[in-house]
Design a protein with these regions (language model features):
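Conserved, structured core segments of small domains
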Residues: 1-90
C-alpha cells in the first residue's frame, strides 16, 4: 500500500507532488513488464498487487520509486494469497 509520507505537501494536489511523474513512469514500466497484476486507489491509499516470487522482489521494485526514497509516499507490503479468483486471475 502506498500512503502519503512525511514529505507529502498538503498544499499541493496529488499530481503536483514531487516525483509524481517519475512515480507514474515507474509504475507504467512495471505494468508493461507484467510485474503489476492490479492497481487501485481508495481514499488517500494506493494499492498495487505485484506479480513477484517473494517479498525481496517487491522491495526491489519499490526501491526504484523516487516518491518512496524522498518520503512523498510510504509503502507497506502484505502477502496476498487469493482463495477466490473471481474475474481477475492471478
Amino acid at each position: 500500500r502506498f500512503r502519503p509520507g512525511p514529505a507529502w505537501d498538503q498544499a499541493r494536489p496529488p499530481a503536483a507532488q514531487s516525483g509524481m511523474a517519475e512515480h507514474g513512469a515507474n509504475l507504467g514500466r512495471l505494468r508493461r513488464e507484467g510485474r503489476i497484476q492490479l492497481g487501485a486507489r481508495y481514499g488517500d491509499t494506493g494499492l498495487v498487487v505485484f506479480r513477484a516470487p517473494d517479498e525481496a522482489a517487491v522491495r526491489a521494485h519499490l526501491a526504484a520509486d523516487p516518491t518512496l526514497s524522498s518520503g512523498v509516499f510510504t509503502a507497506e507490503i502484505d502477502a496476498f494469497a487469493p482463495f477466490y479468483h473471481g474475474s481477475t486471475r492471478l
